[in-house]
């Protein structure tokens, strides 16, 4: 990004306009088409919200007393990496869920992320979700690095939880606990399954089976789009920085980020 700024300066162009004018229409490294490309939109929206039009082009020309004022912009592009991953989950009759994957947490927040995914998908309080990682006896999953661990193992975990939800719906139907066919309208929350006017706890459902627990496996595999398209998330950052011309003290007055990370 500093090199882009230097090039824009030598070309006599605004660094934001220079970036927009040189936006690629395909991946310059692979030649693949982009699955999506929202960097320009991030830059434009950020510039409007930040007030980029108030920037003085000449370095050192904007000041407030001893404070030299500078505006900066930078682009963010993060590649989407999806690796084959598997997980296994167990829902106990006590209403707690345990998940296993052989990936590790190297400070990337894997325990927290996977707990959140399982809790949200199953409708359980986070305190009733237990994640076990880092054992080769567990299902093979992605490594940890950047964000691909969450995208890969997290997707496999979500798949396992969705399969568990299907099992619970099937049990309720087979036991005659719900009168209508299971649909996507079923809701899960607070350790319960709600279908229409019927609310059943996970504990009730497992007791009906006579089993101490239920298990489900989940997995994710990269599809054709992973090979045919260049996939990224995008962002743009804007900063206003003040530098004391006498002491060299630097103060970051404002930071703004605009991101297109998908849903």
Describe the predicted segments one by one.
Residues 1-41, 45-48, 54-263:
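Cofactor-binding beta-sheet edge motifs in enzyme active sites
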